[in-house]
Amino acid sequence: MTFYSDEIKRITKLIAPHDDLTKKIVASKIFIDKHYPDDLSLDLIAGKAHISKFHFIRLFKKYYGQTPNRYLQEVRIANAKKLLLKDKTIDHVCAAVGFTSKTSFISLFRKITGTTPLAWQRKKAILKNK
């Protein structure tokens, strides 16, 4: 039995130091989810987690499979889609999800979805009315 208890102690010691970092990364993801409309930067988010920017990027990607910037972009576009379904204007949606440039918003929307926000909105409206 001591072999197993020794092994459990050894593994616990290996995992424990990372537990705090895991909590910080999870908290950062939650922060992004809540504050995506705000002007967020990697420096701000990593600073709130008390982790260097480069270490934060590496850890976030390790835990979530994508960079924090990419995650933020996807959260913004997902929320933009919800607003577009409510027949909001492109200008309104752009500002509501944290973009300061309509051109940047349209470009990123197209990159992620394969279509423009207006075309996406029209397509969903047609499908909704069928």
Spans of model-derived segments:
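Inter-domain helical "communication" segments and dimerization helices
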Residues: 1-38, 122-130
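Basic/polar phosphate-binding segments, predominantly the helix-turn-helix DNA-binding elements
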Residues: 2-16, 42-75, 96-119
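Terminal helix-turn-helix DNA-binding modules in bacterial transcription factors
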Residues: 29-34, 39, 62-100, 123-130
